[in-house]
Amino acid sequence: MQLNVSGAQAIEVSERTFGGEFNETLVHQAVVAYMAGGRQGSKAQKTRSEVSGGGKKPWRQKGTGRARAGTIRSPIWRGGGTTFAAKPRSHEQKLNKKMYRAALRSILAELVRLDRLVVVADFAVDAPKTKGLVAKLDTLGLKDVLIVTDGVDENLYLAARNLAHVDVRDVQGSDPVSLIAYDKVLVTVSAVKKFEELLG
């Protein structure tokens, strides 16, 4: 299949990488797994044995007419412990490499279908200046965009750092969440070739 390149000749790309069907279930699974992996998992609550105090029986067992109680830190008391207290844990979800790559292929193919993938021969800025990058994006009519390059471009990264709706990634730093988060994805021809190498 062919991909149109902005201001240049169309390029031949792999049907497998850029022309497959959209697997919504798999993409959803990949996005959830990716976001779960980013969770800190450090929340913690205290059980009745961990809450401070409550060592003394508040009143005797029998004869008061009140319900029996052994501690003021029982979960049914105000200020008591939590019955099933949350503890620090990993929220990581397993996703096979094969599935992860298939999800990325599915996203790329859908971006092509929805006309959200913009391919350019090359994309760089002369200096790490936001103004220069904004002007360059304006000529392409792009506002909310993820820029994907073949390798890390320091100038481009620094120029985009102050823009809320622009992000810069290299091919290996691209993930399911970033690829679907922006209105448009701007990729260079060399990045397209790299995607084919990694996902083909």
UniProtKB/Swiss-Prot annotation:
InterPro entries: Ribosomal_uL4, Ribosomal_uL4-like, Ribosomal_uL4_dom_sf. GO terms for molecular function: rRNA binding; structural constituent of ribosome. GO terms for biological process: translation. Gene3D superfamilies: 3.40.1370.10. The keyword Ribonucleoprotein applies. Keywords: Ribonucleoprotein, Ribosomal protein, RNA-binding, rRNA-binding. Residues 38-65 are annotated as: Disordered. GO terms for cellular component: ribonucleoprotein complex; ribosome. Part of the 50S ribosomal subunit. One of the primary rRNA binding proteins, this protein initially binds near the 5'-end of the 23S rRNA. It is important during the early stages of 50S assembly. It makes multiple contacts with different domains of the 23S rRNA in the assembled 50S subunit and ribosome. Belongs to the universal ribosomal protein uL4 family. PANTHER family: 50S RIBOSOMAL PROTEIN L4 (PTHR10746), LARGE RIBOSOMAL SUBUNIT PROTEIN UL4M (PTHR10746:SF6). This is Large ribosomal subunit protein uL4. The lineage of its organism: Bacteria, Pseudomonadati, Pseudomonadota, Gammaproteobacteria, Pseudomonadales. The gene is rplD.
